[in-house]
Amino acid sequence: MLIAVPLDDTNFSENLKKAKEKGADIVELRVDQFSDTSLNYVKEKLEEVHSQGLKTILTIRSPEEGGREVKNREELFEELSPLSDYTDIELSSRGLLVKLYNITKEAGKKLIISYHNFELTPPNWIIREVLREGYRYGGIPKIAVKANSYEDVARLLCISRQVEGEKILISMGDYGKISRLAGYVFGSVITYCSLEKAFAPGQIPLEEMVELRKKFYRL
């Protein structure tokens, strides 16, 4: 299980240093939260993360799934996906999916295909369909959904376990905190933690997750 820390560009160098010192494996660049989204600026941040020996997830979240509008979004994806270890694109952004799959495959990088629901955990058939669609497009499916009960958490993890392959599973909110650690047992390969601020409900602080990973998984 790899630990990712989402960062915007506020105090970027300082927070990057903290992320490395506290044990993060990956920095997720939340470009939709950047103050400057010009190509050269974002590229510099990507290169800065790599210079510290950490992997990167390039994320430019769409407004429909909790992000902000970035007018040069497609350009950034096309130019920077070959440089990032992972690129995160929403399943709903179908116009970009095939293009990004081809770009990342040619560059030897990985594509995360994400689905978000900030209100509830959807029915079982939707969970299965999202996973299968993610694999069909050649990526690692990521499901991040709001848990309104512990039953929601158990359902997401157990249903997802029935579909083979790498995946990322997140139950958001207080009920779902356990999924950020236990998801590994059910095939989840990356967990997201907070550094200075949480980018999603229920994120566990980085230092705490590093210790929990050592304690439970000896990783």
Curated annotation (Swiss-Prot):
Keywords: Amino-acid biosynthesis, Aromatic amino acid biosynthesis, Lyase, Schiff base. The active site is at H116 (proton donor/acceptor), K142 (schiff-base intermediate with substrate). Its EC number is 4.2.1.10. It catalyses: 3-dehydroquinate = 3-dehydroshikimate + H2O. Pathway: Metabolic intermediate biosynthesis; chorismate biosynthesis; chorismate from D-erythrose 4-phosphate and phosphoenolpyruvate: step 3/7. Signal peptide: none annotated. Involved in the third step of the chorismate pathway, which leads to the biosynthesis of aromatic amino acids. Catalyzes the cis-dehydration of 3-dehydroquinate (DHQ) and introduces the first double bond of the aromatic ring to yield 3-dehydroshikimate. HAMAP family: AroD (MF_00214). Homodimer. This is 3-dehydroquinate dehydratase. It comes from Aquifex aeolicus (strain VF5).
